[in-house]
Amino acid sequence: MKIIKASEMGIGPAENRTKPMVAFVIACIIVLGNVQMTSAQTARLLPTASGTGACTDIMAYGGSPANRDNGTALAVALKASSGDGRCVYFPPGRFTFASNFKFMLPNGSASITLTGAGADVTQLYWPAGGGLTIDYVGAQNSVHLRNLSLTTGSVGVGTAVLLNQTNGDVGVADNALNELSGVTIRGADGYSQNDYWDRAVEIKQICNVNLVGLVISGPGGAAYSDKGIGVVLEGSTSNPAVVFNVTGATFDYLSKGIVYGQQVQGLTVSQSNFVGDDYGIYVPANISGLDQLTVVGSQFNCATAGIYVGSSLSNTLFSANLFIVPNTGRGIHLQQAYLYSAVGNSFNIGTAQGKTYPIAIEVGSTAGGGTITGNLFDSMVTAILLDRTSSGANVQSNEYSNDLTTVNNLGTGNTVGGGTP
């Protein structure tokens, strides 16, 4: 058997191996020397949002979980970023703010990002309410809140996030995209405990907003809550609020999950949950300028109504949703109905039947017709109630199981069964 020498295997004599070894040791020493930097030095070297896209660490500007008020540190960190893009990172920990933090975007094209290490990993905490207020000055402004929690130590005080357009004549064309992603809003004492915000998110005269993975928790202690509001959308005649996408969100134990205000259009809710609320999605009476509501693939268990429409809201679509309807209310209540479709939803009882409730779908005064088809109704007192002021409803091909009344048609010009052309 031939024995291969080391030199034949590509490994030279010992004297030839010393130089690579020395070079390797020297390289390691250099690398280790460069690593020995303080966290503050590292943070200050992070590029800002106007540079390569990374964020400034608030710890580099005096922010700390040990501070009683991090408002000054956040203001300094935001101002330290140059250009139109400003980004501040909050590491793990609870950062206290003594009062409302208000920031006005400096020009018509400015944008900011506040990001954390993850919801509940990073907390922005207001012992006495307060929250964040961001004032816009133009249509190209945008705000991005990501991966953090906003908590309060108070009961029913303050708004956690207020996005406010101060320019009175922006219109709806070509607005920049805004987002809340991976954000949790709750009391500092935990989920569905005692503390809660009066309003979690308020969006005034802002367009193009994505709410993704948003979690809002109100006060617990009962099967259904009548305190706290999740998201409030508000527009105006000169600045209608248009295009809102709510995806993978959770609204628990609130008086109302999502509330329409004046001049709101284009809300889409998908893959979201409304549990323990009084109302899930709420459109109050006597408001105008409303259009387009789409709710798909979501689940509701609400005391009074999963979805309530009290003003004329045209072009509404409800499809592939699950409604758990207790004996205190309705699944869908269209008090003002206008060009609506309820297709492929499931309505199941949440408690024992009462004398009047649960009602799965109730349709009131109708400005335009609608379709109710392909739905499943189980153990409702009344599956479908068409009020005396209803008209133009087309009710076809639904499945009924153990319902005391399938369709109660009190209106005029409604079609129940019999197929369509």
Please give the residue ranges for each predicted region.
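Acidic Gly/Asp/Thr-rich repetitive segments characteristic of extracellular carbohydrate-active
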Residues: 58-91
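Bacterial N-terminal signal peptides
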Residues: 22-34
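Extracellular beta-strand-rich solenoid/capping regions of secreted or surface-exposed proteins
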Residues: 75, 79-81, 96-115, 123-176, ...
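Short glycine/acidic-rich loop motifs that flank beta-strands on beta-rich extracellular proteins
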Residues: 86, 98-100, 119, 123-131, ...
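N-terminal secretory signal peptides that target proteins for export/translocation
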Residues: 1-17
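Boundary at the C-terminal end of the N-terminal hydrophobic targeting segment
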Residues: 38-40
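Leucine-rich solenoid repeat scaffolds
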Residues: 373-421
